[in-house]
Amino acid sequence: MDKKQLLRNLPKIDELLKEEIINRYLQENSRTLVVDSLRQSIDHYRGEILKNNIDSFTRENVVNYFIDTLEENKSTKFKKVINATGVVIHTNLGRSLLAKEAIENVVKVSENYSNLEYDLRKGKRGSRYSHVEELIKKVTGAEAAMVVNNNAAAVMLALNTLCEEREAIVSRGQLVEIGGSFRVPDVMKFSRAHLVEVGTTNRTHLYDYENNINENTGVLLKVHTSNFKIMGFTEEVSSEEMVQLGEKYKLPVMEDIGSGTLVDFSKYGFTYEPTVQSSLEKGVDVVTFSGDKMLGGPQAGIIVGKKKYIDKMKKNQLTRALRIDKMTLAALEGTLKCYIDEKEAIENIPTLNMILSSKDIHKKRAQRLKRRLQNNVKDFNFKVSEDLSMVGGGSMPGERIPTYVVKVNSDKITAEKIEEKLRLSKDPIIVRVSKDEVILDVRTLFERDFNIIVEEFKKLLK
């Protein structure tokens, strides 16, 4: 059939609305939603005809496409996915998962009125920051604390408060890009601090900072390169040395430690990453870090340090523009409460638990998933193998975590096609592909995910 005839055969919306099956959907859904979905179905087939992708279609094809489109239009665009990549803090998949305590706290304050900015003891207006400030101080040892909506905002607010129209001295090797083309120099520019780069990419000495201090210097800045490592012939100035230099010239020292861990991972066999507590113990005046990376909480920028500097930031007009909402506060409070006991934090905060859980545990889980797939899915090959997971989220660069995975292949469908179908399934499953094998890393899977994975694999060849 030629293209013109195919286009003429496309049904009209008015005709389809008279059909019994469409009428059933009209009874359950708004007319606007049904008509829009019908139009999308017809437009789809018109496009396929014009591209010469089809040489025939039936009315039933159009109706079936309408049904799928209607269901998709009814569903929310922001949905849960199953992370089988083994990347624990997956930036594109929402970073850290919240602890049960944090989720319960969010639900409680979201479905009810709350004392967000109300002091129950005094019966007067209160501060939203008071709900978490004492907790942050308790788990970090800081004099004072406040929270904004992300770490870039925390850096911008701190720099704007400490050295607006003044100079911030930073090592050239620490001018990192934090993802999505957001760079530390650009954040500094918007804070209205003047960047002064010192040293070289791989080596910076204390005298590089000292030689650039003048009457217009506002802050000595140290940025932890949490998303990359420079190896070999390197040199950087320690926090202790910077604090001594700051004291000598009466300048505040600020450190952005990015991922912001409260747990010393070197105790568990990982490469040492600076903790918030260690930076404060060394005398750093202001420390900024993220809430949704190594902390395992919601997206937030946490600022801790000397009270005189934090108090100034609270009064900065930028603070209102950067403030967090009640749900973030509730999630952060629930997360921080877990940190009162480190063992409890590791058990209850999914991010910490996934990173620190042993390889042996995941071997048993991988074997369990493989058995369930083999017992329920035909025409696929499944095998358990050793592999490596990643921390992700711009944290612990170069660190790999031994794990076990289930590798999948089939003579009837390519690994790339399996990946695509799983990604586009009702409950999207995000996997890795390597050497024509699909890789399911159980480190980032929950037991509840196994049933869904089995059901989606059963549909792949249909």
UniProtKB/Swiss-Prot annotation:
The modification N6-(pyridoxal phosphate)lysine is found at K293. It catalyses: L-seryl-tRNA(Sec) + selenophosphate + H(+) = L-selenocysteinyl-tRNA(Sec) + phosphate. Its EC number is 2.9.1.1. Its main location: cytoplasm. It is found in: Cytoplasm. Disulfide bonds: none annotated. Its cofactor is pyridoxal 5'-phosphate. GO terms for biological process: conversion of seryl-tRNAsec to selenocys-tRNAsec; selenocysteine incorporation. NCBIfam families: selA. HAMAP family: SelA. This is L-seryl-tRNA(Sec) selenium transferase. It comes from Clostridium botulinum (strain 657 / Type Ba4). The gene is selA.
